[in-house]
Amino acid sequence: MRKVKKLFTLLTALYMSLMLPVQVMAAVELNTKYEVDTNKIQGWPQAADIASDTGILMDADTGTVLFDKGGDQQRYPASITKIMTLLVAVENSSMDEQVTFTETGVRNVTADSSNINSKIGEVMTMQDCLHALIIQSANDAAAQIAEHVGGTEQNFIDMMNQRAAQIGCTNTHFTNSSGLPDENHYSSAKDMALIFREGLKNEAFRSVIGDADYTIKPTNMTSDKRVFHTHHIMFRNTNRFYDQGYIH
């Protein structure tokens, strides 16, 4: 658990700084420059600026914000939307549930969409789908998880927004489970950090987030196994600047 929390501290800074500005989607001023807000706190260690417009670093145990640059500004969260999809899914399902792919999921199997080439009628476990969601960023898995858990995709999206409000998010609204572009789909660095921190309280969430590799065995529709590997440098430990304890 401690290693996962250490990893969270690093990944939060990365994920939240990678959020794309909503200004490309909605009526928000372009090229807004934000200062490092935590540098304004008297006696607080002064941090260097980051290249990203916004970013946040949060302590997973206490929720203390250690670094904040435009953390409350709305941004298009792209695929880190799937962090909330994962949280709502693990809170409302079990890993061994059988998920049958329908048109809802398979319609996302396109050349310009990250997917696992699922097929209508194909059956996988929820555990398979969640690993495809996180390691492969599979949009077909995201949509199918949503329908399976929520009954309909829209019901699941409503669950995502309700859960975000419960966690304390104030600059977040989801319109889909995968992070596909929509002018009404947005979050902030702080809100996503709150969501991630909430997820760490759940053992199944931690298990999925902590896996760098996963294999889906042959299914009723596919004879080949699907092997997933994360290429994230913090997991792969190939860079001398990362401490091993943080990326185990």
State what each model feature region is.
Residues R2-M25:
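Sec-dependent N-terminal signal peptides of Gram-positive bacterial secreted proteins and lipoproteins
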Residues M1-V4, K69, Q73, D224:
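Intrinsically disordered, low-complexity sequence elements enriched in Ser/Thr/Gly/Pro
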Residues A26-K190, L194-E203:
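Active-site-adjacent loops and short helices of periplasmic peptidoglycan-processing enzymes
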Residues P21, A48, P77, S177, ...:
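Proline-rich low-complexity regions
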Residues C169-T170, P181-Y186, K190-H248:
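Domain-terminus/edge residues, biased toward the C-terminal soluble/receptor-binding domains
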